[in-house]
């Protein structure tokens, strides 16, 4: 990369200079060496010891989870079930909370390889209360994969004590009950701007679970959410939960996201309700 950019940047006359030619050759050798090292690193299978070393090196840095992603992917892509169990054990026995959080990352539900935590989830439920934000978040990511009454109760307790900042709303995606609507509505109603992760959780909860009482929650999330992609699924969730107000559908015709515009057009076209029905909801359509 350096050789090509330098070669292109220098005039041809300069490239005839012995000093410049030597510099170009040196940079080329260095670049080739880096490429060989990277290729070898990609071929070599990452071990749990490697992950431990990388995690400990990143623990004091900013955004360590993001920096750990490549190594995690390479490990999880080739790891056997036995190796994943060994990694889970290593995470539970790790004393440094940030390192433990990084080692739990491969078991998060949002990963592409979908490898649920293979051991007892009780320690994860304890970690979800951690004051170490990264550890609490990693534990909740892992717990999202499971449907369990204990997880529902944990989600409610975390939301009541720590609010939406606890990331516990995600635990209701699989563990939602209709009695949760009041709690969710209270938390959403207090939010001026709905963070992206909350939009994601609301859309997933109500796209999966139909609730006639969800419309106020969805309307507030639609109005105050910051992500256009999530807004599309909030509108879909409204439709699933009983109907989309015509006023909202009209707004959606001018949404920046083309799929939202198309969805609104289809609903309006298929509905018997026209522009004079501004205060009404478009009926649930199959």
Residue ranges and their predicted role:
Residues 4, 14-18, 26-36, 46-50, ...:
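Generic helix N-cap/helix-start motif at coil->alpha-helix transitions
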Residues 169-231, 235:
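Alpha-helical adaptor scaffolds
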Residues 26, 30, 40-44, 75-79, ...:
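Residue-level signature of the C-terminal ends
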Residues 23, 51-55, 84-89, 121-125, ...:
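Buried hydrophobic core positions in alpha-solenoid tandem helical repeats
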Residues 35-42, 54-56, 73, 87-89:
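Charge-biased C-terminal accessory regions appended to nucleic-acid-, cytoskeletal NTPase
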Residues 245-286:
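Eukaryotic acidic, Ser/Thr-rich intrinsically disordered low-complexity regions
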Residues 1-8:
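Single conserved hydrophobic/aromatic residue that forms the stacking wall/gate
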